[in-house]
Design a protein with these regions (language model features):
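Glycine-rich portal/gate segments that line the openings of hydrophobic small-molecule binding cavities
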Residues: 18, 28-70, 123, 127
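Short strand-connecting beta-turns/loops that link adjacent beta-strands
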Residues: 3, 32-35, 61, 85-89
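Hydrophobic ligand-binding cavity/cleft-lining segments
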Residues: 1-34, 130, 134
Length: 135
């Protein structure tokens, strides 16, 4: 339904996340070039607040790697892949690996992050339908 370039653009525009991700309370872009986007995402979900920063290495329009630069984790890394399916569609894949920096944070934020990871791709596909209406 949507091209790799369209989906890549939605993922890269993290400043738009608060418009369609209910858990996202804000986003600050620190740097954006053709190959890197560095940003901080603010989580505000059912009264739980946290933030984390990543540096995302971009290979337009097919891949993006996320690497933690700051936040309540010992590590966090992720990978987006946008694989073309014909001329006008793509397969969207997202993987996220993380470990919280304490058991308490894991207990509080773990369910929130599980929810985020499990609904992330679907949220972007729904957003694409709003941003790129079909002719």
């Amino acid at each position: 339904e949507f091209t790799p370039a369209q989906m890549f653009e939605l993922v890269d525009r993290c400043e738009d996340y608060p418009q369609f991700l209910p858990w996202c309370g804000g986003a600050d872009v620190h740097q954006r070039t053709d190959t890197v986007t560095a940003a901080t995402l603010h989580i505000n979900y059912h009264g739980i607040k946290a933030h984390f920063s990543t540096e995302n290495t971009k290979r337009w329009p097919n891949e993006m790697d996320l690497r933690l630069t700051d936040g309540p984790f010992t590590h966090l890394d992720g990978h987006w892949r946008f694989t073309p399916l014909g001329d006008t569609a793509c397969k969207v894949e997202f993987s996220l690996h993380y470990q919280f920096s304490s058991k308490l944070l894991e207990k509080v934020l773990g369910p929130v992050f599980n929810h985020i990871a499990n609904t992330f791709v679907d949220s972007f596909v729904k957003r694409a339908a709003q941003v790129y209406p079909r002719a």
